[in-house]
Amino acid sequence: MKLGIVGLPNVGKSTLFNAITSTKNAAAANYPFCTIDPNTGVVPVPDARLDKLAEIWDTNKKTPAIVEFVDIAGLVKGASKGEGLGNKFLGNIRECDAIVHVVRCFEGTDIVHVEGNVDPVRDIETIDTELILSDLEVVSNRAARMAKAGKTGDKKALASAAWLSALEEHLGAGKNARTFPLDEADEDQVLQMREMGLLTAKPVIYAANMSEDDLMEGMLGNPHYQTVKKLALDEGAECIPICAKTEEDIADYTPEEKKEFLAEMGIEATGLDNLIKAS
């Protein structure tokens, strides 16, 4: 499983990547496009059952499931037209199986926001719009080809043109491809959808990046998190609360130190563990 970590510049993508992989490889700087070429890291999936089995069999040999994370360059408006690092950004996402969308849910002027203020819904819509526009071009081109082939009497092409046009209309309304009512019983639809590799057809996990204080207070007092959580629920997606900076700070802690830290915070598991498991 390969997951792309995406989000607007300065929302905490590289900080989160550093914490996930327990490295300092991804330069986390306070300016856009700090991550230009994607950083890649492979991490094991936490599994208490595996630890228990190793204890029972008295062995140190464990082979956990692994997840590959890719830190992808920050996005700006116009990426679908090649603005900023748009072409590179979209190409990197296309190579991933799923998306971890990091959304800024913390206030503060020490870290600049490219739009000047914190608004997670606007930020999500900015990225979604660019991904949808990219998908729309792919679907429109294929629909046109199928419609042209259908004029020669190709019934299969005509059928494809019909559902592709419906998908084109769906995307044109600003909706993600993953919410399109695909006919799973139609092998041709399923195959073509897979061939197109649409960006918005990929599963998404929202990582709500907030302050350590908000995590300690139970997140109920953070309206930004509540907004993202509702949006994710409406989409049928997951929303994981996380403090990327704190996770980076404790990345090198021993298991015992992390356990003590979690107890002090009043939480059962780190946001990173929850994110990796959700992947």
Model-inferred region functions:
Residues M1-V112, V139-N141, R145-M146:
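Conserved G1/Walker A P-loop phosphate-binding module
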Residues K2-V6, V11, F17, R145-S279:
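C-terminal-of-GTPase-core extension/linker across diverse P-loop GTPases
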Residues T15, K52, T126, V138, ...:
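Alpha-helical scaffold segments in soluble metabolic enzymes
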Residues S22, A29, E55-K61, G84-L85, ...:
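Residue-level detector of functional hotspots within protein domains
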Residues F33, D47-L50, T63-F69, E83-D97, ...:
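Amphipathic alpha-helical transducer elements in NTP-driven molecular machines
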